[in-house]
Amino acid sequence: HDITEDIEFGDLPGLKKFKVEVQGFQEIYNLACPTAPKDYAKFPVKTAVANSVGVVNSLEWAKKYKARYLLTSTSAVYGKPPENGEPVKENYYGLLDFLGPRAGYNEGKRFAETLVTTYQDAYQLNTSIARIFSTYGPRMLQHSGRQVPDFIRNAVDNKEIEIAGDEQSVLTFCYVKDAVEGLIALMASEISDPINIGSEQALTMTEVAKKVIEITNSSSTLSYTNKYAYTMQPAIPDISKAKEELNWFPLVSIDEGLKSAAEFYKSTAFLRRP
């Protein structure tokens, strides 16, 4: 279902056995938004609408069924990170280009957070906001502009690995299983303020690409490009709040996570053959 369109859950045949109109929903996780880098150029309007109309629709469902609501926001709401590379806490506010090619996503997520807190105050909704930092793992879409799946695909095929940025470009990587456990912990809590979900370990993209080459036993070489206008230097999260209030922190190492993602890609290669 398109989240930007309203829906009557009781009219869906697949949900009739759940008796939604009687039992309702207890929890709503809103993860519905284009997030791959190339989507910013391909679906700019849909991205902005998902972060506005789509969020309103899902909040109305939470209001109707008195469900606890969790919005998955993004590290992009922090805008330009501190120049000294210091990890950002939830109260950090950086400059953000609200008219740039990523505005439908970056500024859209800021507006989505505003909608959530406004509904919370106006209708006493039970809400929470997770600011997700870079996440990776198996089943990620190929050719989406995301670095890890692109690295793995090219490494397996022994093709050149193209890095968006230079040799010093850094990013943090949180394995999907860890991120999901963070969301579940947040939903089970009574926290309503935004909270960072991500890894504190910053790695250069060069380091990650070399790890992928080693894991896949590839002969790929590296190159660097700045052609992606929709990319920006991301912030590094301070997750002390998640550690203290959710007892959550990432457990899967980057080597273990990359190995899992690479193994999945290789095991499903036959599905992508023409």
Question: Where is each model-derived feature located?
Answer:
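N-terminal Rossmann-like NAD(P)+-binding domain of SDR-like oxidoreductases, especially those catalyzing
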Residues: H1-F133
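Residues that form or immediately flank small-molecule/cofactor binding pockets and catalytic motifs
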Residues: I3, E8, Y93, G137, ...
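Generic recognition of short, well-ordered alpha-helical segments
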Residues: G10-P13, D39-K42, V53, E83, ...
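C-terminal substrate-binding subdomain of Rossmann-fold SDR/epimerase-dehydratase oxidoreductases
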Residues: A155-P274
